[in-house]
Amino acid sequence: MYAVLVTGGKQYRVAQGEKLRIEKLEVEVGSEIKFDNILLLGDSDGIKIGDALSGAAVTATVLSQGRADKVRIIKFRRRKHHMKRQGHRQYYTEIEITGIAGGSK
């Protein structure tokens, strides 16, 4: 069984046992979190699609909090002896999917 969930303004296709990095959530490491905003549920019988399926939920365990690798940004103006360097490290929460509960549309 798999599901498409929405968190942090992004959509993720998940299955039980998967590990993934999502936008940072203010939760403790080791805690259990529940996602209710599920757009799609799929299994061998077919799929259920809807805007926030009622009764559907995905549970996950928080594995770690961290920061991604640095992304380097360089702005350069030719022939003007001008260059601007900047860097960014995005915060993330790493989770493991522990369960997918189905619901009705």
Swiss-Prot record:
KW rRNA-binding (keyword) present: yes
An example Gene Ontology biological process: translation
Keyword Ribosomal protein: yes
Cellular component terms per the entry's GO annotation: cytoplasm; ribonucleoprotein complex; ribosome
Alphabetically ordered keywords of this record: Ribonucleoprotein, Ribosomal protein, RNA-binding, rRNA-binding
InterPro entries from the UniProt entry: bL21-like (IPR028909), bL21-like_sf (IPR036164), Ribosomal_bL21 (IPR001787), Ribosomal_bL21_CS (IPR018258)
UniProt similarity note: Belongs to the bacterial ribosomal protein bL21 family.
Subunit structure: Part of the 50S ribosomal subunit. Contacts protein L20.
Entries under HAMAP family matching the protein: Ribosomal_bL21 (MF_01363)
Function as written in the Swiss-Prot or TrEMBL entry: This protein binds to 23S rRNA in the presence of protein L20.
Protein's UniProt name: Large ribosomal subunit protein bL21
Species per Swiss-Prot/TrEMBL record: Stenotrophomonas maltophilia (strain R551-3)
Lineage: Bacteria, Pseudomonadati, Pseudomonadota, Gammaproteobacteria, Lysobacterales
Gene designation per UniProt: rplU
